[in-house]
Amino acid sequence: MKLYSINTGYFKLDGGAMFGVVPKSMWNKINPADENNLCSWALRCLLIEDGNRLILIDNGNGDKQDAKFFKHYYLHGDDTLDKSLAKYGFHRDNITDAFLTHLHFDHCGGSINREGDKLVPAFKNAPYWSNRAHWDGAVHPNDREKASF
């Protein structure tokens, strides 16, 4: 079995929202905030090569949303899912299983691609795996989490 770290880019979120009750004086040392209290976060996935299976755990935020959506997240960096897969000699069509830890946009937004006016699965040779609780939460989100879907 081989494991690969797959970086799909970076985005920014409010440090206080991410670290909660942990004082800024502590978290700011390891993840410094900018002038708007935003911290950079890696959109990193895990690729598992096991025999003839290539399992992708999460897939980043993708690019199907519009500019209005993404302007809130300050996307930066040159990494993409396709570039990171290619670095190890793989293509998205090689993925045999797409596992989603949960259904927030930054973990599963790359599951679907826009082709013209249609949305199509990004991994055409892979079933998608998650669980019922996450599906129900995404379809019927609570007020606190609905912006994440």
Feature locations, PLM:
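Short, glycine/acidic-enriched loop or turn micro-motifs at the edges of active sites
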Residues: 61, 105, 134
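A short secondary-structure junction signal
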Residues: 67-68, 110-112, 139-143
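Metal-dependent catalytic neighborhoods of phosphoester/phosphodiester hydrolases
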Residues: 108-118
